[in-house]
UniProtKB/Swiss-Prot annotation:
Cofactor binding note of this UniProt entry: Binds 1 [4Fe-4S] cluster per subunit.
Cofactor(s) the protein needs: [4Fe-4S] cluster
Similarity comment text for this entry: Belongs to the IspH family.
Protein name (Swiss-Prot/TrEMBL): 4-hydroxy-3-methylbut-2-enyl diphosphate reductase
Listed Gene3D superfamilies: 3.40.50.11270, 4-hydroxy-3-methylbut-2-enyl diphosphate reductase, catalytic domain
Active site, renumbered: E122
Function field: Catalyzes the conversion of 1-hydroxy-2-methyl-2-(E)-butenyl 4-diphosphate (HMBPP) into a mixture of isopentenyl diphosphate (IPP) and dimethylallyl diphosphate (DMAPP). Acts in the terminal step of the DOXP/MEP pathway for isoprenoid precursor biosynthesis.
GO BP term, example: dimethylallyl diphosphate biosynthetic process
Residues reported in the UniProt entry to bind (2E)-4-hydroxy-3-methylbut-2-enyl diphosphate: H36, H70, H120, T157, S213, S214, N215, S257
GO terms for MF: 4 iron, 4 sulfur cluster binding; 4-hydroxy-3-methylbut-2-enyl diphosphate reductase activity; metal ion binding
Originating gene: ispH
Amino acid sequence: MEIRLAKSYGFCFGVKRAIKIAEESPNSVTFGPLIHNKNEIDRLKEKYNVELVEEIDEIQENSRVVIRTHGIPKEKLALLKEKNVEVIDATCPFVTKPQEIVSKMSEEGYSIVIFGDINHPEIKGVMSYATDPIVVLSVEELEGKPLKEKVATVAQTTRKFEEYQKIVNYLMEHKKEVRVFNTICNATFENQDAARELSREADIMIIIGGKNSSNTKQLFKICKENCPDSYLVENAKELEKEWFEGKKVCGITAGASTPNWIIEEVIENIKKIQV
C-alpha cells in the first residue's frame, strides 16, 4: 500500500507560535486549552509544567498566564489584567484580526455577521468585541435575522471558504452596503485544498488531529466528500487494521494543531500494518 502525505498539513503559524511561547514560559498556566490537541497539551504539562486552568478563580496570584491561541472574550481578559498575574498573549494574530475588525465596524454603525460556530472559543472572543453580533453557520440561519442596510461580515479562521461565500452572496443580494472581510486563515485554505486534492486520489484517508478541533473536523468533512473511507484519529492507537484491507493508496493529512511527532507515529504504525 502506498502512503501519500498531503502537500500542506499540520502545524500552522499561530500554533507554532503558541507552542514556542508555552515552552518559553515553564511553570505557567494556560487559560483554557492552548490548542485543540490533548496529546500536545499533555506533553507541555509533562515537560514544561504548563498547567491548564478553565476558570479565572483557579488562577493563583503571581502566576504567569498564557492566553490560548483562540483568544478569550475581552471581559475575561480585563478580569485577568486586574489580578496580580503576568499575562502572556498567545492569541493567534489571525484571530486578533477579526476581533479588531468587528470592533471598528460596530463603532461605525454596521450590523455584524460572523460566520462560525457560536460555541467555539474563537467566536466567543470575537463576539465580545462586537455590538449585537449575529453568528450563523448557514444562509438558512441568516434568513429573517434583523440587520441594518449596512453590514460587515467576518469568518471563523478555520471554516470552509465555499460556505462563507454563500453567506456573503446572500448578504450582497439583500443589503445595500456589505463590507466583506475574508478572515479565513491562509493555512486553512492551503490545508483544505491539499486535502481535497489528495482525497480524490486515495482510497483511504487518515485525518490526524483533535476531535474537538474545528479545522481538523473541516478537513475530515472535505475528505469524506471525496473518499468515503476517511477516518479521523487523534493518535496511532486509534488506527484499526481492517480499515486498510484491500486499499492501495492511503492519504494522510493533519489539522493545524497536530504536532509532527504524532503524525510520524501514525505513519510508522500504518507502515507496520500488513493487510
